[in-house]
């Protein structure tokens, strides 16, 4: 892919939005309507491959120039590489999800402002309905998106007060039973792509839902609310 990457983007990184769009273009046979779980996983894997390919080339060019013994410049460069990887992983995850929601005809707002200036990653059907006191809260859904959870999953609990049951989508495999039990006690529903379910215990799998199931929940609520796109 390197020649095409350089032809398109030169010796530099495009925005995450542009790069995510490009990653999907290289997978024309993947259709989210048929299998949202497979599509999300395929898009993420392909973008990771493409990004590492371009990154290796760009970083190689910089390393070949050397740092002339400038330790601070080297450390700064190293940190920028690490930070770019972290930020791009999270944004790519959201970009591909946004594309899938659009293809499936799901209405949403991304990082809409709720109480205390909180910004849930995705709010369904959107901020207008959320802030409408007449709109039935049972037809509202929020989704936090974290490529890896660790202890950060608790952040989503305070991001949408009108919604009792929160949803969290992650790519993290084998989250501990203690953690998922705590999620359940906090009324947080974990969403994991189908391909990762086997890394969880049978008991956990009976509770975890996949991406397809989540999109069906949102579409059903959207239909109940009489919202059409």
Residue map of PLM features:
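Interdomain/boundary linker segments immediately adjacent to catalytic/signaling cores
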Residues: 3-91
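Acidic-basic catalytic patches of nuclease active cores, encompassing PD-(D/E)XK
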Residues: 70-118
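Conserved catalytic cores of phosphodiester-cleaving nucleases, focusing on short active-site segments
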Residues: 122-147, 156-158, 168-169
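Short beta->alpha connector loops
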Residues: 146-151, 171-175
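Short, charged, amphipathic alpha-helix that recurs within catalytic cores of restriction-modification
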Residues: 152-169, 178
């Amino acid at each position: 892919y390197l020649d095409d990457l350089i032809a398109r983007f030169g010796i530099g990184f495009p925005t995450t939005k542009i790069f995510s769009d490009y990653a999907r273009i290289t997978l024309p046979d993947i259709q989210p309507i048929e299998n949202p779980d497979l599509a999300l996983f395929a898009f993420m894997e392909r973008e990771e491959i493409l990004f590492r390919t371009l990154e290796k080339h760009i970083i190689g060019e910089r390393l070949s120039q050397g740092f002339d013994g400038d330790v601070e410049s080297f450390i700064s460069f190293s940190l920028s590489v690490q930070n770019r990887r972290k930020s791009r992983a999270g944004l790519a995850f959201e970009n591909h999800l946004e594309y899938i929601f659009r293809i499936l005809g799901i209405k949403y707002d991304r990082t809409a402002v709720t109480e205390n200036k909180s910004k849930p990653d995705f709010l369904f059907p959107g901020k207008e309905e959320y802030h409408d006191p007449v709109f039935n809260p049972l037809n509202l859904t929020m989704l936090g998106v974290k490529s890896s959870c660790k202890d950060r999953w608790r952040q989503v609990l305070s991001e949408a007060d009108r919604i009792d049951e929160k949803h969290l989508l992650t790519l993290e495999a084998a989250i501990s039973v203690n953690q998922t039990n705590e999620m359940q006690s906090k009324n947080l529903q974990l969403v994991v792509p189908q391909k990762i379910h086997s890394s969880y215990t049978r008991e956990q799998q009976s509770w975890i839902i996949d991406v397809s199931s989540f999109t069906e929940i949102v579409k059903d609520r959207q239909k109940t609310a009489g919202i059409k796109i």
